[in-house]
A protein has these predicted regions:
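Glycine-rich phosphate/diphosphate-binding loop of Rossmann-like nucleotide-binding domains
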Residues: 3-57
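Glycine-rich beta-strand-to-loop/alpha-helix junction loops that act as flexible
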Residues: 28-29, 48, 76-90, 248
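Proline/glycine-rich low-complexity loops and linkers
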Residues: 61, 71, 84-191
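Polyanion/phosphate-binding surface patch
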Residues: 73-76, 243-245
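An accessory alpha-helical subdomain
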Residues: 164-253
């Protein structure tokens, strides 16, 4: 299906579209799967991608990695480093940008709603996010919050000197959902890739490793094509592979 993003994309600050743009994916230790997925998607959109670059789980390591990336990149993605009791990614990003960590009401509401829905005892669950998941509500000042439909940790977006910086959880399922449903318009706006077409290819196997090998081969041979196994796309005989191509004009599709 081909679509134009008019009406589907948020109101993004007007900016000059770049012919070429560079992105770096910073993978906080333990989030390599999400980082690899993100790097593949960015290449398909049209970015020159550096990484994933593994970063230790510490505020200082994230701060240094983000500072370095912002020197040369138009887009920086941080995967992982956000857990209910500790969010070194948020803290490190705040330090790198020289911004304060502030309690974000939208993030707080998201965390509370997530645990209220997950809990069997509503009264007990109300205390959980406030006492044990406060790290997920303290965000760098000026953050745009991305809703996470699959977990408690929100994604965030910040703009610094005309560059975008995005943080997503380390889980592939969570990072992918945030990216596709929330972050994509911002990422694509940098290079004007407002158009896309998607097809679903049905396989005849339930072997995930076999499907993964096909996805990897497509990524290596045609990096401008974004292929992924979608567990919600399947037939009676096997998994489906979702294939998306991005473009700057309908004529390119």
């Amino acid at each position: 299906m081909k679509y134009v993003a008019v009406g589907a994309f948020p109101d993004i600050t007007e900016r000059k579209v770049k012919e070429r743009a560079r992105a770096r994916v910073l993978s906080v230790k333990g989030s390599s799967e999400a980082a690899l997925w993100t790097a593949r998607r960015l290449r398909a959109i049209g970015y020159e991608v550096e990484g994933p670059v593994e970063v230790e789980v510490s505020v200082k390591a994230v701060e240094e990695a983000v500072r370095s990336a912002l020197d040369t990149c138009d887009l920086v993605i941080v995967t992982g480093g956000v857990e209910p009791n500790s969010a070194p990614a948020f803290e490190g990003v705040a330090a790198a940008l020289g911004r304060a960590l502030v309690e974000n009401e939208e993030a707080k509401q998201h965390v509370e709603e997530y645990y209220l829905l997950e809990a069997t005892d509503g009264a007990a669950s109300e205390l959980f996010p406030l006492k044990r998941a406060r790290a997920l509500t303290l965000l760098p000042e000026g953050s745009t919050v991305f809703h996470n439909p699959r977990g408690p940790a929100p994604g965030i977006l910040l703009e610094e000197g005309g560059r975008y910086l995005i943080c997503v959880p380390g889980s592939l399922a969570e990072a992918g959902a945030i990216f596709e449903e929330e972050a994509d318009p911002y990422v694509r706006s940098v290079i004007g890739a407002y158009f896309s077409t998607t097809v679903h290819v049905m396989t005849k196997t339930w072997e995930e490793d076999a499907v993964a090998s096909v996805v990897e081969a497509v990524s290596e041979e045609a990096p401008w094509v974004f292929a992924q196994l979608k567990r919600t796309v399947r037939s009676k005989e096997g998994w489906g592979i979702t294939v998306t191509v991005f473009a700057k004009s309908p004529d390119e599709l």
